[in-house]
Amino acid sequence: MNDSILEPKHRGNVREIAAIDLGSNSFHMIVARIVNGSIQVLSRLKQKVKLAEGLDENAVLNQEAITRGVNCLALFAERLQGFPMENVNVVGTYTLRRAVNNDEFLRQAAKVFPYPINIISGQTEAKTIYAGVCHTQPEKGRKLVIDIGGGSTEMIIGDDFTPLMAESRHMGCVSFATQFFTDGIISPENFQRARQSAVNKIEDLGLEYRKLGWQSVLGSSGTIKTVAQVIATNLDPNGTITAERLNALIEQTLQAKHFTELNINGLNQDRVDVFVPGLAILSAVFDVFHIQQMRYSDGALREGVIYSLEKNFQVADIRASTA
């Protein structure tokens, strides 16, 4: 990343803003420039922190995970030198919501990171994800948006830019890895237990969501991105996820006995340890909501946070003007 582009410039109507998403698997930062109401993404930075891995059964976040998170924030702070407070929006998600000692994380973070951290509710997270997807995708009309994160999964139905239903449930690829795939061991039984647990967490939403209906289904964040990449590499250049392709991928995945044995074209090494639990959650989502096909959206929570900092930008420009 070129640090020089991060100097806040206020010539004319130019403003630079930053959005940071403290996720349960990775921390993400986007820096964007607002020019006369239009947004241009200048840079993106992602660090795998695996915060959720440090959450024990009593919802206490261990010091190792806190240290990983704080070290990442120190790096982000270097990149943001000179940014005024009002131009930076930082949100904490599932793991920081859940941790009973999140005040300790915030205390240690404040020593290296000068910007306030807002720990947001699951519903706020869901609505912000929806805004991020809507402002980066061309689909019009009613859509279902699914976001599988490290610690939680968000499900939102909306018309154009207005969310109608937004829910967040405690199931994510990092937390499920710890819960159902101890030491990275894969078995059909482990997979089915994870999948059934996900079904149990969302089946109360199925009927209500299906009654509302939708014209298109969009998925965001790492699990769905990875599944789309694997499908694009092996089955369909467009990376469209269908129920049939998902089942074929599950069948292939279950031939491995351990995360380290996953040898799937298109699967990046940094996703190997969360791919199978993410797949179990996605399979449950497809079943409960009777999804026929889903397309990956590269807009998600951090894009929604950028949008919340600058509500007046022209919607088309986040697609057209990405640097």
Swiss-Prot record:
Catalysis: reaction(s): [phosphate](n) + H2O = [phosphate](n-1) + phosphate + H(+)
EC number annotated for this UniProt entry: 3.6.1.11
Location(s), subcellular: Cell membrane
Annotated keywords: Cell membrane, Hydrolase, Magnesium, Membrane
Entry-linked InterPro entries: ATPase_NBD, Exopolyphosphatase, GppA/Ppx_hydrolase, Ppx_GppA_N
Pfam families for this protein: Ppx-GppA
Membrane topology label: Peripheral membrane protein
CDD domains per the UniProt record, alphabetical: ASKHA_NBD_EcPPX-like
Cofactor annotation: Mg(2+)
Gene Ontology terms: biological process: polyphosphate catabolic process
GO molecular-function terms, A-Z: exopolyphosphatase activity
GO cellular component, one term: plasma membrane
Cross-referenced NCBIfam families: exo_poly_only
Role played: Degradation of inorganic polyphosphates (polyP). Releases orthophosphate processively from the ends of the polyP chain.
Family: Belongs to the GppA/Ppx family.
Subunit structure: Homodimer.
Protein name as annotated: Putative exopolyphosphatase
Taxonomic source organism: Haemophilus influenzae (strain ATCC 51907 / DSM 11121 / KW20 / Rd)
